[in-house]
Design a protein with these regions (language model features):
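Secondary-structure boundary/capping micro-motif
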Residues: 1-160
Length: 160
């Protein structure tokens, strides 16, 4: 049996197990920009494991769990604000299912004044990166070109 937050590889796609309800497992593709949780039957998972078409993988976001966040920093503030937005949603199991997710998100949008697109993005980021508060940290580590020289020798912008 798979545990919650396990990452598996199936058909060149990495999936994270989000929940294990009585019907089977709920998983999400962690590499897709527009993935949503899907329910997959436990019998199907067991058959895929038996046929060796489903393999365990290392968690690519495993370092986020223990990543230290400086107290009072902008990163901590953003993470906490994002967590406040989705906290009421992630406690409800109905948010995993397409038929009820839209209504829950619409209700939360009306409560907070946040666009639907933002809530969907934050939920997806939370689920794909390990269902921990640090999953909502900003991606500033991907910005810039560390170690690269600037291509231009002139300053950018309009000349004075």
């Amino acid at each position: 049996m798979l545990s919650i937050n396990t990452v598996v590889l199936h058909a060149d796609c990495r999936y994270r197990i989000l929940e294990a309800p009585s019907q089977g497992y709920i998983w999400i593709d962690i590499d897709s920009d527009n993935a949503f949780p899907e329910l997959i039957q436990a019998a199907v998972i067991n058959q895929l494991f038996h046929d060796e078409r489903l393999k365990l993988q290392d968690d690519p976001y495993g370092e986020l769990v223990n990543e230290p966040v400086e107290q009072g920093s902008k990163h901590q503030y953003l993470r906490d604000e994002r967590m406040k937005l989705i906290a009421p949603l992630i406690t409800q199991e109905d948010v995993y299912f397409r038929s009820t997710r839209g209504k829950l998100i619409q209700k939360r949008c009306e409560e907070t004044g946040t666009p639907k697109k933002t809530l969907y993005k934050l939920l997806r980021q939370y689920w794909q990166r390990g269902c921990v508060p640090n999953a909502l940290l900003p991606d500033y580590r991907n910005a810039g070109g560390k170690g690269k020289k600037k291509v231009s020798t002139q300053k950018l912008g309009r000349p004075r």
